[in-house]
Amino acid sequence: MKILKAGCFLINKQDKTVALVYRKQFDDYSFPKGHLEKSETLEDCAIRETAEETKRIAKIVKEFEPYINNYVTLTGKECSCYMYLAIDNGASDNKSKDTHPTYWIPFEQVEDKLTYQNLKDVWNSVKDKILSLIN
């Protein structure tokens, strides 16, 4: 059975920055994302996971289709991760304990900050859309 995940490219338009989370247990920088829960839409999952991991409210930009990253996990399971472009809409009151330190990275530095090549490839596939959104 395919694993479904969703997350956000969370953008601060005023500062032209992108939120990355630092996951201490993996010593990596990533976009906020996570597993789809039962009876949850992919958009709802992206918003919830972003709120849990960053304590920020994500407002999905409906004009852009999600980027779908298909891959196989280290344990051999197929996974599809739907990544939505979203604008930061302020602090969230989410009470999750799954929060990670969140860093607002200047647009030009995101690729260098990401830990894994597959995430750098994802970023390079969407950065022009994000640039059009923040300019």
Regions picked out by a protein language model, each given a short descriptive name:
Residues 36-61, 67-122:
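Unchanged
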Residues 9, 121-124:
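RNase H-like, metal-dependent ribonuclease domains
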